Curated annotation (Swiss-Prot):
CC annotations in GO: chloroplast
Role: Component of the dark-operative protochlorophyllide reductase (DPOR) that uses Mg-ATP and reduced ferredoxin to reduce ring D of protochlorophyllide (Pchlide) to form chlorophyllide a (Chlide). This reaction is light-independent. The NB-protein (ChlN-ChlB) is the catalytic component of the complex.
Protein name per its UniProtKB record: Light-independent protochlorophyllide reductase subunit B
This protein's UniProt keywords: 4Fe-4S, ATP-binding, Chlorophyll biosynthesis, Chloroplast, Iron, Iron-sulfur, Metal-binding, Nucleotide-binding, Oxidoreductase, Photosynthesis, Plastid
Family label: Belongs to the ChlB/BchB/BchZ family.
Assembly behavior: Protochlorophyllide reductase is composed of three subunits; ChlL, ChlN and ChlB. Forms a heterotetramer of two ChlB and two ChlN subunits.
Molecular function per GO: 4 iron, 4 sulfur cluster binding; ATP binding; metal ion binding; oxidoreductase activity
Domain of life of the organism encoding this protein: Eukaryota
Lineage of producing organism: Eukaryota, Viridiplantae, Streptophyta, Embryophyta, Tracheophyta
Length: 103
């Protein structure tokens, strides 16, 4: 969560953590899904992709290399899916550089 806050990304839902059946109606509001643990959420992400065309990222963000790749995939999705009224594209490379510079 801290990493997503650092990137100024709002979380729509964390499933199944604290979720209810009523919350499920909001799942399609997300631009894309993050699946940090394939064992838990991959089947749901595949279903949402098939039914609603929602892309997903299933790279496990563990270790500097995978976290950097995870952020780059988020970067690609945000810039691709952002409303056309938003002319400002995000650039997370400075964040990646700052987090991995001394590793």
């Amino acid at each position: 969560r801290r990493l997503l806050r650092d990137l100024d990304i709002e979380i729509n839902q964390i499933i199944p953590e604290g979720g209810s059946v009523e919350d499920l109606k909001d799942l399609p509001k997300a631009w894309f899904n993050l699946i940090p643990y394939r064992e838990v959420g991959l089947m749901t992400a595949i279903y949402l992709n098939k039914e609603f065309g929602m892309p997903y990222i299933s790279t496990a963000p563990m270790g500097a290399v995978d976290i950097a790749e995870w952020i780059r995939q988020i970067h690609k999705n945000v810039n691709t899916l952002a409303p056309s009224s938003s002319s400002k594209k995000v650039d997370y490379e400075p964040y990646i550089d700052g987090q991995t510079r001394f590793v």
